[in-house]
């Protein structure tokens, strides 16, 4: 173990430099071509073979050559759209506001340290490193096009890797994630759970008419959408606190011209919850609100559902093992345990 720590200290500056480079050059999911290239350069320098998988993903293996369990290390490296972020890309406002660049540096450093310390000579089994693309559930039209073109089969990178069977050999998967904790003394968190979610693409279809001369001849799809939002907001008091429900949305198309009654309005939304049943129960309420609003305004309605991520529950034995190692670096008072986050992830 001491040799691994020594190698980590030696590798750390290069790993941090790589992570900072990726931070300053963010790419959205299934577009991480440059980020992958930087990781590949680091693996080549260490003489570790790798395989490109899942469109923009990457996989590498340290093999002891002896029968034994396989441990997987997972790192994400996609960014998320953040308008106004100081390091946002000029083309798509992509920024590493979720900290995936840090995962890249951390897991690469661990993998290289295991290799350089010669750990596999004293172990059985394998250690696999996965750079998984497209964790952030965004830029969905682009991803749907990739699916239509047959380049991927699923909207997220880990879903894609699961479908390809890339995790099948692994007995255990380890990952890490930066957390934007504010006003806290905690420096680490273990055993946290997360909400799951489903994604909806909603289209209200009305009838165009001149908004000044003949508005009575039109059917205003924008009114249907605003009515639906009001209905969803009125439902919020029916969401049980213990279900940790979140329903949030954006308008992706709000009309074609001010001079016309809006005939097509599009919105996307997430429904998040602590359990699958909580998500399904809330989804039924939201769908009823959407249908009721469309019916009230006499609009047609289209709802396209995309499976998101399951709620996250971590393995208790593995969590305790990780916690015991964190205690080597900080006191117990700095470790948060068993919290629930209402965000989501695809681990």
Task: Please describe what each predicted stretch is.
Residues 27, 76-78, 134-136, 179, ...:
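Active-site beta-loop-alpha junctions enriched in small/polar residues
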Residues 22, 161, 269:
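Residue-level signal for inorganic ion chemistry
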Residues 10-13, 30, 34, 38, ...:
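Conserved active-site and cofactor/substrate-binding residues in soluble primary-metabolism enzymes
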Residues 45, 226-347:
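Metal-dependent amide/peptide-bond hydrolase catalytic core
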Residues 85-95, 101, 117-248, 255-260, ...:
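Histidine/acidic-residue-rich, glycine-tolerant segments that coordinate divalent metal ions
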Residues 77, 178-180, 206, 253, ...:
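Glycine-rich beta-alpha junction loops
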Residues 1-97, 101-128, 133:
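Acidic/His- and Gly-rich active-site-bordering loop/insert found
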